[in-house]
A protein has these predicted regions:
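Short glycine-rich phosphate-binding loop at a beta-alpha junction
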Residues: 3, 91-100, 120
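Short beta-alpha junctions and helix-cap segments that line functional grooves
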Residues: 37-39, 49, 105-107, 239-242, ...
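Nucleic-acid-processing active sites and adjacent nucleic-acid-binding tracks
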Residues: 57-90, 94
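Extended, highly charged clamp/arch subdomains and adjacent linkers
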Residues: 1-36, 55, 78-83
Length: 476
């Protein structure tokens, strides 16, 4: 029992670690930013729900189109999309990656808009959970679940972090065995990841929802609601100092949260940076010492190079703090997340029947587990790159090689249409390691002493004997 408990605890810790790391990567996925978007939640019989959002993610229009069987209103759908892109000055289109996603993407890509409109596939896992949630009902009391789901897809494209915090992380589908692990420990770990991601990126206090604000360090759910209520009543915050007027925003809370709240366009440019208000006087002193204004210090790298870091080190301000401040002054308020890139699947692949062994195709990493990575290559079933196939070198942790939403090139090694399984490899040609189906160990391990296969096996205890019986059952 002790051994079983120890094994379960270790397995739980590993599963929680995998889920937490995947969630962190998903939350920090590349945002499109403030752009007007058209989002499509694809479907066949029930049609594709279509919404237009403004640059802040507000719903401005919704309708449905029926380009696929049984209605097959392809040309009418093309005309509707083209008209809406022109009417609402749409800059990008997001297509959900669920049922009929590829066909809908093909439809959108066939349209000549007469201008550049970037098209993205958006992971819609959990969108249906959001659309039926209390949060969604509160945001869109007069819309049905299909409209809410399409809005969620569009907002995920604009800013994945702001939208995904509204969904229970367990519904996003990026873990392994998450329903079998200790749920209290899992929730605690995931909450820490969300809070860490939100604080890492920072939050625009004038546009953030209360669901996002409550993950900022020091801000409770009640205070988040008070911030939104104050903003609604008094208009946008003009400075970080104004936050002190919000009910329940005490000095200690302000000290905890101020550095993570951004105010774009504030009179003091530091209000849109990660520099904490208690360090403003230090930055102002730096500017004065090089005979420059705060704005000049931010704009001109040559002025920042003149700063003698050691001069500002005190008991409470270390060298690392000074370096962090100077780094932030290079690009105040910069988003630390990577820039979004447009991606296309192989146009010749529409279903698993089109996938052939030996094909090299582009794909997107959709899930990472301890045993490998799942990759979407544009068919309904994701393919698996086993951990042994991720690299020509030995890999102990798949996260060392791939990240969620990463664009990768994969080669098909196995296709089982009946069981809907696709085996993939990311190994490059010329590697010394074995490919799927070949024998032998990895070269890195060849220097280990050879096993003596003539040696008599050690006697089994009762537990080992049962374990061996189980293994035989699964292998037979």
């Amino acid at each position: 029992n002790e051994f079983r408990l120890s094994s379960k605890t270790k397995a739980d810790e590993e599963a929680i670690h995998v889920f937490a790391e995947n969630l962190r990567q998903l939350l920090l996925a590349s945002p499109l930013g403030s752009k007007k978007v058209l989002a499509l939640d694809p479907g066949y019989r029930t049609g594709c729900k279509l919404v237009c959002l403004d640059a802040q993610g507000n719903l401005v229009y919704n309708t449905a189109i029926y380009p696929h069987p049984p209605q097959n209103e392809w040309q009418a759908s093309v005309a509707t999309i083209k008209q809406l892109v022109a009417k609402y000055d749409i800059e990008a289109i997001g297509v959900g990656n669920g049922t009929a996603g590829r066909e809908t993407e093909t439809l959108v890509r066939s349209i000549d808009f007469g201008k550049t409109v970037n098209i993205f596939q958006v992971n819609e896992s959990g969108a249906s959970i959001y659309s039926a949630s209390e949060v969604a009902r509160e945001e869109f009391p007069d819309q049905d679940v299909t409209v809410r789901g399409a809005v969620s897809i569009g907002r995920r494209l604009l800013d994945p972090l702001s939208e995904l915090v509204k969904i229970d992380p367990k519904s996003i589908g990026v873990g392994q065995y998450q329903h079998d692990v200790n749920q209290v420990k899992l929730k605690s770990a995931l909450d820490r990841v969300v809070e860490s991601a939100v604080n890492f990126v920072g939050v625009d206090v004038n546009t953030a929802s209360k669901h996002l604000l409550q993950y900022v360090s020091g801000i409770s759910s009640t205070l988040a609601g008070n911030i939104v209520a104050y903003r609604t009543q008094n208009g946008p915050f003009k400075s970080r100092d104004e936050l002190k007027k919000v009910s329940l925003m005490g000095p200690k809370t302000f000290e905890q949260c101020a550095g993570f709240l951004r105010i774009p366009g504030a009179a003091n440019p530091l209000d849109n940076s990660s520099v904490h208000p208690e360090r403003y006087s230090l930055v102002e002193q730096m500017a004065a010492d090089v005979q420059a204004t705060l704005e000049d210090l931010i704009k001109k790298a040559e002025l920042r190079k003149q700063i003698n870091k050691r001069k500002y080190i005190t008991e409470t301000v270390g060298e690392f703090t000074i370096e962090d401040i100077l780094k932030e002054l290079e690009k105040p308020g910069r988003d630390p997340r990577a820039q979004i890139e447009e991606f296309r699947f192989d146009e010749t692949i529409k279903s698993i029947e089109d996938v052939k062994v030996g094909m090299t195709v582009p794909g997107i990493v959709t899930n990472i587990t301890a045993f490998g990575a799942f990759v979407d290559i544009g068919v309904k079933q994701d393919g698996l790159v086993h951990v042994s196939q991720l690299s020509n070198k030995y890999v102990s942790d798949p996260n060392e090689v791939v990240k969620l939403n990463q664009k990768v090139q994969v080669t098909v090694t196995e296709v089982d249409v009946a069981r809907k399984r696709i085996g993939l490899t990311m190994k490059t040609a010329g590697g010394n390691e074995r490919t799927v189906g070949a024998g032998g160990e990895r070269k890195e391990r060849d220097n280990r002493p050879a096993k003596n296969f003539n040696k008599k096996p050690e006697p089994l205890n009762a537990f080992q004997s049962k374990l061996m019986d189980l293994k035989k059952k699964f292998n037979d």
